Amino acid sequence: QPSPVPVGATVMVWIYGGGFMSGTASLDVYDGRYIAATQGVIVASMNYRTGAMGFLSLGNSEAPGNAGLMDQNLALTWIKENVASFGGDQSKVSIFGESAGAASVSYHLLSPMSKNLFQRAIMESASALSPWALLPDAEAHRRGVELAKAVGCSTDSDIEETIECMRGVPALTISENEWVVWGLCQFPFAPVVDGNFIREHPTVSLQTGNLKQTDVMVGFNNDEGVYFLLYGAPGFSKDTQSLITRDQYLEGIKMSVMGINDISVDALSFQYIDWVNFDQPSMYRDAIDNLSGDYNFICPALSFGKAMASFMGRKTYQYKFVHQASNFPWPKWTGVM
């Protein structure tokens, strides 16, 4: 909080990212003192369960999914009830988050359980429309069963017995076996339409206006795809210039867009190749960066923002971040991640 302690200050609540698989509010990069000191606002955050601990969904009341989002909801409830004691105004709360945190922010806009807990929202690099931000029920159930098998719990018996077995498994064992499914820009556990916190598919809510209609800001960075490409795409490494070949480019498309067929690979390849600068050594690298970033982060953010902008009487803002800091720890070619 600012010093001296204000009265009726705006409140900003941060929700960290991490693919719904990891993260913590205590990272130095999330230190809210700088915003509080320079802008005179109250900055709050919370930890929430991630991975299987936060998003295991087996389709019953014992493992319904979205526990991590419910953690966030509980924190928002506490903040609304208590922030006045810290100099904040409960009627001036803005929630903001990055990546999975941005997707979380959009889910709070969509959920009737959260809509009265804040006033405005900022989504940085993603939304609930991101392909990794929502799992179909059947796929979420399959992944939960695979995890149960991996930690030695039988899935042949009643599902309640399986869950009871998993409760006896050490947390470290659970976390060590969570990556039962892997794909570039894909995460094993994520939110589901549970009929409680998330009551319908996000696209339905956006089409019907069945969500909190308020002022929002959406944005993204210039090179959203690079960070994930460095963790598994063919030919990518932070220790090289990652000047990939055409074959590696095509393979990267298949990894970035899961389940894509060959015709779609060819279409995307043609669309993203820079035909004007075709002879540039970095051309294929930059093309897959743009494709992966568009598919996983930029287009979902813009689509969500466009839908919000269609509601009368509300303001929607958009930004694109293109500045690379002088102390940026990654190679210069990685751009603005």
Swiss-Prot record:
Enzyme Commission number, as recorded: 3.1.1.8
Protein family per UniProt: Belongs to the type-B carboxylesterase/lipase family.
An example Gene Ontology CC term for this record: extracellular space
Keyword line: Disulfide bond, Glycoprotein, Hydrolase, Serine esterase
Gene Ontology MF terms in the entry: acetylcholinesterase activity
Protein name: Cholinesterase 2
Active-site residues annotated for this sequence: S99, E224
Native species: Branchiostoma lanceolatum (Common lancelet)
